[in-house]
């Protein structure tokens, strides 16, 4: 839910979601419709994505336990087959849920801006440049991403206070 929304907005949506559904799983999510999901703060696209994901799980076409045993690119390929889930979402799932050590979401705007600030660049690096810049951090790019996100958060808080 944090994609393209502020962390504060994501937290507020999550709190409203917790009040609207007692226990969330694929089947309970499928009892809701787009309108109810939008009522807890999800955009239309995110509501439809959540319903698509729930349907895949409910029908047995997506098994999160199996994802744990797949290679990173296999997980990305599996998740991005679901309408509304792109590479960034799959990469963040690999980082957060599967704790994979070498994921670098090169197209992440916060990472790009964090790297721009850390390296004192006059421009936001491209996705290709981000891959090249992160090459020395292999096989631990996830840790570099987490540190860069932390830097970005501190950087944006600092700018907001100025």
Features from the language model and the residues they span:
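Alpha-helical ds-nucleic-acid-binding substructure associated with the helix-hairpin-helix region
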Residues: 5-83, 136
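C-terminal accessory module of base-excision DNA glycosylases/AP lyases that mediates lesion recognition
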Residues: 87-162
């Amino acid at each position: 839910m944090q994609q393209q929304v502020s962390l504060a907005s994501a937290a507020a949506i999550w709190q409203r979601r917790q009040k609207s559904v007692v226990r969330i799983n694929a089947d309970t999510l499928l009892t809701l419709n787009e309108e109810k999901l939008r009522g807890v703060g999800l955009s239309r696209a995110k509501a439809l994505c959540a319903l698509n994901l729930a349907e895949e799980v409910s029908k047995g076409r997506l098994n999160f336990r199996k994802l744990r045993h797949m290679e990173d690119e296999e997980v990305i390929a599996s998740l991005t087959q679901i309408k509304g889930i792109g590479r960034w979402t799959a990469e963040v799932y690999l980082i957060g849920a599967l704790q994979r050590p070498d994921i670098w979401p090169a197209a992440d705007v916060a990472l790009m801006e964090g790297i721009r600030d850390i390296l004192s660049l006059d421009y936001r690096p491209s996705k290709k440049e981000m891959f090249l810049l992160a090459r020395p951090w292999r096989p631990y790019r996830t840790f570099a991403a987490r540190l860069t996100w932390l830097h970005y958060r501190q950087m944006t808080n600092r700018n907001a206070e100025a």
